[in-house]
Amino acid sequence: MKQRLFIFIFLIGIMTSCTTDVVDNGIIIDPNPEKPDPEPVPEPEILPSLHVEGKWLVDPQGNQVVLHGVMDTPNMYFNGWRWGSPWTNNTNYNDAGAKKCLDYFEKIFTGLEKAKCTVFRLHLDPAWTNDPDNSYVYAGSAGQAADASGEADISKFNPERLTHFLDTLYLNLAEKAMKHGMYVVVRPPGVCPGNLKVGDYYQQYLMTVWDIFSQQSFVKEHAGHISIELANEPVNLKNAQNKEDTKALHDYFQPIVDKIRANGFTGIIWAPGTGWQSNYKSYKTHPIEGDNIGYAVHDYTGWYGCSDESVDRDNNIEKSKEKKIKEFYNSVPVVDFAPVIITEVDWSPVKPGEGHYNEHGDWVESNYGTWSTGSTSKWGVCYKANLDHCGNISMTLSGTSCLIDVDQLLKDGSVVPAFGGEPEACGKACMDWYEEYYGKLKN
């Protein structure tokens, strides 16, 4: 009896073992093997912090860094009404509108990352900071010229709206850009009026903007990734006595820099020049003082002695390149001792159609949709020659739509050059250049 019981228990043991092990060609296989832990999802690559050493942007490993990207502005009109309009879907510059804007720019940043962009110039667009109340007048606009108009008019600026939309829009845009591998250069709301002088109302306006901005914890925590461009396109700037003075630029912007530093922001600050950001001669003798200082420059066709008409592409292109480099050095001597970023530049060739007069009263031939008219094989090669010669010039094209076809991106996620890939326009040229520069950056 005991023997039978033993055999029975033995058989039960075999049957039980067969429920966990399967024999296949003599190999015991566990039908419920332990699953290996899933591969961890890699964390997004963290941008190295940047600082200034001499005339270079430098990362923590001492590598010299040059950045390439675009500027853009969170504005329904300038974004082609792609994320809303007051007429079609009741979109306004409020918190609900901010969410739509953020969703739109998430798609834009995805495309810019694919286009090998490493920097984004963010405009704190006044559409958000201006108060919609018709009766509201910003007290700080006292002293503004009666004919101030457009984005040079600060009479509707509301500091409380700036603070609010820094929290709900602007800094969220900056964070999104950084998560897509781009450093962020922040420009103040609007543009400078035509005439400035040390101690004027507009200097105080900029002081207020940057005081509020540089107190933000997020900004100070990301001082190696977010930088400040102090003003957009000063034209004429005089001293406190309204006289020409080589120290006027320094005296206008140095107090603003000092306020930013007093608030604890240690990151890079980009100072502008006069002449719509084309003249930096006075900074050679009176530079902005302190650490992490660079200069923000603009470059368009016809500036710095270079245009399609002046370039001898067929007979002596090297001489044309040398002239561009010489004229740029003459106007922007700071490139010898500080990093420079060209925060506005674009070009496209003449295209049959109607031209127009720009805001300076200059006639502009019809082109593919850029501010200035020129071609890559003439003006463009001289522009790039200057970038490569200097070595310490970063750049942002004047808009996302100057680099990539935004509508195509939104349609199917593909990233193709703007203007149908026209080889003489900045979109195709810069997509090629950015890929080249990106490869060097990663190697």
Model regions: which residues?
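A short, well-structured catalytic beta-strand-centered motif of the EAL phosphodiesterase domain
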Residues: L67-T73
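Short polybasic amphipathic segments
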Residues: K55-D59, Q408
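Extracellular glycoside hydrolase catalytic/binding regions
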Residues: S49, P74, W81, P86-L102, ...
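N-terminal export/membrane-targeting signals
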Residues: Q3-D21
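Bacterial Sec-dependent N-terminal signal peptides
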Residues: M15-P44
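Aromatic-lined substrate-binding rim segments of carbohydrate-active enzymes
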Residues: N90-C192, Y205-M207, Q254-G264, Y357-N392
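Short acidic, Pro/Gly- and aromatic-enriched capping/linker segments at domain boundaries
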Residues: E43-W56
